[in-house]
């Protein structure tokens, strides 16, 4: 059978933050598939890169007092560390801020221009009058023009999936300053996705998508065949100041990050090809016989199934074989939350001593070929890992290996390996291969655990610990242990794409060559004695989960000193105020607000200027004397409580349109600290507190 040639990518993480477990769903899903393909003997290259360009990187670097290059180099190191820790086996992990990417972006752009698929037109953009800059899509928020969802970015709605231009937003505001943006005109470059050639191509291309949900969504975007196209031209340029690649022949104009990011897949592969002597053009050229797959989150399906394939098709490159989208991750049935400690970073997971293969196994047990969301239930996580991997799988080796090594010098009884149980395990290989190929990992692991149950039943029936007590049953003991360990070897092959480090430990323990799918037809040999058994994996301790949540619960870190102050005695507690009536309380309108922006107030060492979203369709400006307790960066994105009907107050620094509630001790000098009130993460801006 001829080996397949496969190029695989995962979406590129943005170089503006940490890798968290939500990201890891995708990289683990991809890595399992890649490892399986390698075990099948296919020629596979898995490439990735940091997505490094855009205004967010530029502004964060400015805030930190470093260059964008220094920022992206640091974040690249952090991301690579996290991927290595979670055994994500990239053949090359690169950066979109690379010369290969610049060259490819220019080449593709010029090819599209030669095909008359690039056009220029003046567009009216939002401009921040406070920061004196055009606002990129992700630095404008407002209401979706289609579904009305609030707090949506300027390029696409995360609720309904619609894409639009920023000026279509209702009630927009600048995320940078909180100001209401003004409109200014600027010349921009567009990829003519509305061209009939693009529509015709995309209608043909969508027919081959593997996921029905993706095909249906694309049909929705394309509209009914025979009707006028619903495709819009794509703005591929941004104005200076911008961190990215300048467009050839257009000073002060830069490629939009969403143009150069997917091209970064090819740039990473080109870098790998040059290092390994791979024929790059043979893999990505229009007549390539290689396969190309992109694993992505369902939120970026639009870019990968419309813009990217059309861009490739008309610039002289091959198009993707398929795009595989996955759903979002929830933790204990809810969105990841910093206040609950469930916004778990990859680094915090490993720093607290958690085994990355526990998470790899759990995610695999939940993943399938659909775009449905998956939930990390922490109680189930502990139970499943401890039951499946330790109680069932590892238990087989621990119950058989000791007897084989002590009584038989580690040598198996090869004649005993004709046992029907082993044939049962081998017969499952084609079905398991089909599950892995189809990304039906949950089905694969259910079948593996069924086989594991059968092996444990064999061990329980033969009771090697009882056979070992009777010398006359030495042959039966030898056979039982030999069959058990050969079964363990086969199960390890089936689990290796998911838990590669543990599989490597099994290979050393069983004294076998690295296991691939072809090894299913082999067996343990008496010529290569099994080594003394060593623990392959420890159980998950609930205390580790508690420590992990605590490490990620940032709001509790600030609350700890307050708790200590409270314990100091009644003198630290301010007396309760005079009694009021329910009518008095009803006059105060307390609302949940989201802090969308925060800045220090020049000339004040106490005040912070907060831009708040109360769900009114516009933002409010509030000054709060909490600078001693928080930096602006700590507050952006948090929910808090505001007195919404407090009369606006004109202050030296501007108008304050409400009051943020915060807690403090009666004697702030003796017990310093201010702590804003943070509602439950399920609350939304505008909810009234009663």
Swiss-Prot record:
Binding site for ATP: 338
Signal peptide: none
EC main group: ligase
The family this protein is said to belong to: Belongs to the class-I aminoacyl-tRNA synthetase family. MetG type 1 subfamily.
Record carries keyword Ribosomal protein: no
Any one of the GO BP annotations: methionyl-tRNA aminoacylation
UniProt function note: Is required not only for elongation of protein synthesis but also for the initiation of all mRNA translation through initiator tRNA(fMet) aminoacylation.
One of the record's GO cellular component terms: cytosol
Subunit-level organization: Homodimer.
PANTHER family cross-referenced by the UniProt entry: METHIONINE--TRNA LIGASE, METHIONINE--TRNA LIGASE, CYTOPLASMIC
Catalytic activity: tRNA(Met) + L-methionine + ATP = L-methionyl-tRNA(Met) + AMP + diphosphate
Segments carrying motif 'HIGH' region: 13-23
tRNA-binding domain span: 584-690
Binding, Zn(2+): 144, 147, 157, 160
UniProt-recorded name of the protein: Methionine--tRNA ligase
Cofactor(s) this protein requires: Zn(2+)
Compartmental location: Cytoplasm
A GO molecular-function annotation: ATP binding
Cofactor binding note: Binds 1 zinc ion per subunit.
SUPFAM superfamilies per record: Anticodon-binding domain of a subclass of class I aminoacyl-tRNA synthetases (SSF47323), Methionyl-tRNA synthetase (MetRS), Zn-domain (SSF57770), Nucleic acid-binding proteins (SSF50249), Nucleotidylyl transferase (SSF52374)
Origin: domain of life: Bacteria
């Amino acid at each position: 059978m001829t080996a397949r040639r496969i190029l695989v990518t995962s979406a590129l993480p943005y170089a503006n933050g940490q890798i968290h477990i939500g990201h890891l769903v995708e990289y683990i899903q991809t890595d399992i598939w890649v490892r399986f393909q390698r075990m099948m003997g296919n020629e596979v290259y898995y490439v990735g890169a940091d997505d490094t360009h855009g205004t967010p990187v530029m502004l964060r670097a400015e805030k930190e007092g470093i260059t964008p290059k220094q920022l992206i180099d640091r974040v690249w190191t952090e991301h690579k560390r996290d991927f290595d820790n979670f055994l994500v086996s990239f053949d090359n992990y690169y950066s979109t801020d690379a010369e290969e990417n610049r060259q490819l972006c220019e080449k593709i752009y010029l090819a599209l221009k030669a095909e008359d698929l690039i056009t220029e037109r003046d567009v009216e953009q939002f401009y921040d009058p406070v920061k004196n800059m055009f606002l990129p899509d992700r630095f404008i928020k407002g209401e979706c023009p289609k579904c009305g969802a609030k707090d949506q970015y300027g390029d696409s709605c995360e609720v309904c999936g619609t894409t639009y231009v920023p000026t279509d937003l209702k009630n927009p505001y600048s995320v940078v300053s909180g100001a209401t943006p003004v409109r200014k005109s600027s010349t921009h470059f567009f990829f003519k996705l509305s061209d009939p050639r693009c529509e015709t191509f995309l209608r043909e291309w969508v027919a081959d998508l593997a996921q029905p949900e993706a095909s249906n969504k694309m049909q929705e975007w394309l509209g009914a065949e025979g009707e006028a196209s619903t495709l819009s031209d794509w703005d591929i340029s941004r104005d200076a100041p911008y961190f990215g690649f300048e467009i050839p022949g257009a000073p002060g104009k830069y490629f939009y990050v969403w143009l150069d990011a997917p091209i970064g897949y090819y740039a990473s592969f080109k870098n790998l090809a040059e290092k390994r002597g791979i024929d790059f053009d043979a893999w990505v050229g229009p007549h390539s016989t290689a396969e190309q797959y992109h694993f992505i989150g369902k939120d970026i399906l639009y870019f990968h199934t419309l813009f990217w394939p059309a861009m490739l098709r008309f610039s002289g490159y091959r198009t993707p074989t398929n795009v595989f989208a996955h759903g979002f991750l929830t933790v204990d049935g809810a969105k990841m939350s910093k206040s609950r400690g469930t916004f778990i970073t990859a680094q915090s997971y490993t720093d607290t001593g958690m085994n990355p293969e526990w998470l790899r196994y759990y995610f695999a047990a939940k993943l399938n070929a659909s775009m449905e969301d998956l939930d990390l239930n922490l109680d189930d996580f502990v139970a499943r890992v401890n039951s499946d991997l330790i109680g069932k799988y590892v238990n087989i080796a621990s119950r058989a290996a000791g007897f084989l090594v002590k009584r038989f010098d580690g040598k198996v009884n090869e004649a005993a390996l004709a046992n029907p149980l082993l044939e049962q395990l081998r017969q499952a290989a084609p079905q398991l291969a089909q599950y892995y190929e189809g990304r039906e990992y949950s089905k694969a692991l259910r079948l593996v655990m069924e086989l594991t149950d059968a092996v444990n039943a064999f061990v329980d029936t033969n009771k090697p610990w009882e056979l070992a007590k009777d010398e006359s049953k030495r042959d039966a003991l030898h056979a039982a242990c030999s069959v058990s360990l050969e079964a363990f070897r086969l199960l390890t092959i089936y689990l290796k794409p998911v838990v590669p480090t543990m599989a490597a430990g099994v290979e050393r323990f069983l004294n076998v060559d690295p296991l691939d799918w072809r090894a299913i037809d082999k067996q343990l040999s008496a010529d290569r004695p099994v080594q003394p058994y060593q623990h392959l994996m420890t159980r998950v301790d609930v205390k580790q989960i508690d420590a992990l949540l605590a490490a990620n619960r940032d709001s509790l870190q600030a609350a700890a000193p307050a708790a200590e102050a409270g314990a100091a005695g009644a003198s630290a507690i301010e007396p309760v105020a005079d009694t009021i009536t329910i009518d008095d309380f009803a006059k105060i309108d307390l609302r949940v607000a989201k802090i969308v922006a925060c800045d220090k107030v020049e000339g004040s060492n106490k005040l912070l200027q907060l831009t708040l979203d109360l769900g009114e369709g516009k933002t409010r400006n509030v000054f709060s004397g909490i600078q001693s307790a928080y930096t602006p960066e700590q507050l952006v994105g948090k929910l808090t409580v505001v007195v919404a009907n407090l009369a606006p107050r004109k202050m030296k620094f501007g108008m304050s349109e409400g009051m943020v509630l915060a807690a403090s001790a009666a004697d702030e000098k003796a017990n310093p600290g201010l702590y804003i009130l943070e509602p439950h993460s399920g609350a939304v801006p505008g909810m009234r507190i009663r």
